[in-house]
Amino acid sequence: MKLLDKIIDELNDHLMDGVLNEQAFQNSAVYGLSYLTVPKDDSPQRPYTWMDDNIKEVANPDDSYAFSIYHRCNGIAFKDVPQQTFGDGNGLMNMVCEMTAIVYSDRYKTNYTQEDILMKISAGLNHTFTRTQMGTSGLQKVKATVLRANNNSTAVFTGEYGQEANCPLAMNSVYFGIVYQLEIIAHSSCLSCTNC
């Protein structure tokens, strides 16, 4: 099961159907879980994502869209799940993923400032998913919680594309990163299941 991919897709759907469900955000590029390339020789570092089992470069920032977003997993921690009953274990595992959502928008097209969009995205990212939303009974809990944001556009761009990259952001560009955590409690057997 591509657990994290599915959760990010659900999170994107939640954002687009909720806090971003308005005309200003209809021309959007919404990417799933993305990764940074490891530069070879002089090739530039850049984010990419997998779509239909093919590698696709993330077009961000791209001013042909009013808005774009992609997510990266920065690290995963594992925590104990307290047993609720007596026995040899409850078969549950708790993963806490530190994530970053990288957001670009064109202020002229959306008519929103960086701070306005940051607040909208943060409000939408703070969400606890139900089992019904996730489509599997093996997941006990999926909760996204915003931790902090970096609205220094140049620093975020440099972190994504490297020191040597020319930052092409225009005055009307809104570009920032939101760090959030995903807490996932699942049955261990859920991780090898392919039913969802």
Q: Which functions belong to the PLM regions below?
A:
Residues 64-79, 90, 94, 98-102, ...:
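Ordered hydrophobic segments in well-structured contexts
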Residues 1-86:
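Small/polar-rich, solvent-exposed N-terminal microdomains that initiate assembly or binding
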Residues 31, 35, 48, 65-70, ...:
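Sequence-level detector for tyrosine residue identity
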Residues 38-41, 45, 127, 131, ...:
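Low-complexity, serine/threonine/proline-enriched polar segments
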